[in-house]
Amino acid sequence: MNPYRSYDARIIEVKELTSREKLFSLKFLDNEIEENFTFKPGQFVIVDIRGFGEFPISLCSSPTRRPIQLCIRRVGRMTKFIHKMNEGDIIGIRGPYGNGFPMDLMEGSNLILIAGGLGMAPLRSVLWYAIDSGKYEKIYLFYGTKSYEDILFRDEIIHLLKHGEKLNCHVKLAYEVETPSCIYLERGFSEKVCKGVVTDLFRGEEFDVENSYALICGPPVMYKYVIRELLDRGLSPGRIYMTLERRMRCGVGKCGHCIVGTSVSIKYICKDGPVFTYWDALSTRGLI
């Protein structure tokens, strides 16, 4: 696929996940493009709304599954527009872009997925890829959300709380705002659900730090505390991966909108990332 070209895709399903997020399922009009389109978990695409504008968004589905899916939060002019679109409408897709998570490198190891809020979307791609492939030792998912109503992919999360161990997946959930639904969920899964922040979910957990990788995505304020917890447990900076989705525009490193760092170490978020290790963050000013 030409990385500079936008390909037409039909919206085949729109699902409301929360009051602010919708899940868009897509299929390319060109059958050859549809069959050959592939990507790595952690990569992103540029959504092109013809005659209106474009924006970057992570793929939240797994490369092992169809259709391709995008989880889009309604926050600005472009996302408000696409939230008004319906099944059958056509949008443009170009990409995929970015480096993605090094899934091959991590085969045979434990995966510790740590998501906060909307950060669950790109990590969902990793989650189902890891489950489907069966190439990883154990999968942990620690997910922090504001409330029950804000849980992304709620049905999937509850299914994994119930049956995740059968899929070699250990899931824990933290919520901040106490509601009747959260209390009910906590009663049903007292060892897996609690009121608090995502780092509270580490209590009682032990990891083989020599055979584990941590993958983090969430609001910027979360990274500091999660990384500190991981380092305190002995995980090396090179085994801590973060996906940093901010300030991206063109997707190919041409516009310079996402440059961070200094003359000593410059990174393009869209081209060198959006996935970086904590070692990268230590050597590049402004990365986190």
UniProtKB/Swiss-Prot annotation:
- Family matches, as InterPro entries: Cbr1-like_FAD-bd_dom (IPR008333), Cyt_c3_hydrogenase_gsu (IPR012165), Dihydroorotate_DH_ele_sf (IPR037117), Dihydroorotate_DH_Fe-S-bd (IPR019480), FAD-bd_FR_type (IPR017927), Flavoprot_Pyr_Nucl_cyt_Rdtase (IPR001709), FNR_nucleotide-bd (IPR039261), OxRdtase_FAD/NAD-bd (IPR001433)
Q: Where does [2Fe-2S] cluster bind?
A: C250, C255, C258, C270
Question: How does activity behave across temperatures?
Answer: Optimum temperature is greater than 90 degrees Celsius. Activity increases with increasing temperature from 30 degrees Celsius to 90 degrees Celsius. Has a half-life of 6 hours at 95 degrees Celsius.
Q: Which domain of life is it from?
A: Archaea
Q: Which cofactor does it need?
A: FAD; [2Fe-2S] cluster
Q: Enumerate the spans annotated as FAD-binding FR-type domain.
A: 4-103
- Any GO MF annotation of the entry: metal ion binding
User: How many cofactor units bind, and how?
Assistant: Binds 1 FAD per subunit.
Name where it mostly resides.
Answer: cytoplasm
Q: Which GO terms describe its cellular component?
A: cytoplasm
Q: Which UniProt keywords apply?
A: 2Fe-2S, Cytoplasm, Electron transport, FAD, Flavoprotein, Iron, Iron-sulfur, Metal-binding, Oxidoreductase, Transport
Enzyme kind, highest EC tier:
oxidoreductase
CDD domains assigned to the protein according to its UniProt record, in alphabetical order: sulfite_reductase_like
Enzyme Commission number, as recorded? 1.12.98.4
Location comes to: Cytoplasm
GO BP, sorted A to Z: pyrimidine nucleotide biosynthetic process
Catalytic reaction(s) noted: n sulfur + H2 = (n-1) sulfur + hydrogen sulfide + H(+)
Role summary: Part of a bifunctional enzyme complex that functions as a hydrogen-evolving hydrogenase with sulfur-reducing activity. May play a role in hydrogen cycling during fermentative growth. Activity exhibited with NAD in addition to NADPH. The beta and gamma subunits form the sulfur-reducing component that catalyzes the cytoplasmic production of hydrogen sulfide in the presence of elemental sulfur.
Its quaternary organisation is: Dimer of heterotetramer of alpha, beta, gamma and delta subunits. The nickel-containing alpha and delta subunits constitute the hydrogenase activity. The beta and gamma subunits (flavin-containing dimer) constitute the sulfur reductase activity.
List, alphabetically, the NCBIfam families matched: PRK08345.1, sulfhyd_ShyC
What is this protein called in UniProt? Sulfhydrogenase 2 subunit gamma
Question: Lineage from the top down?
Answer: Archaea, Methanobacteriati, Methanobacteriota, Thermococci, Thermococcales
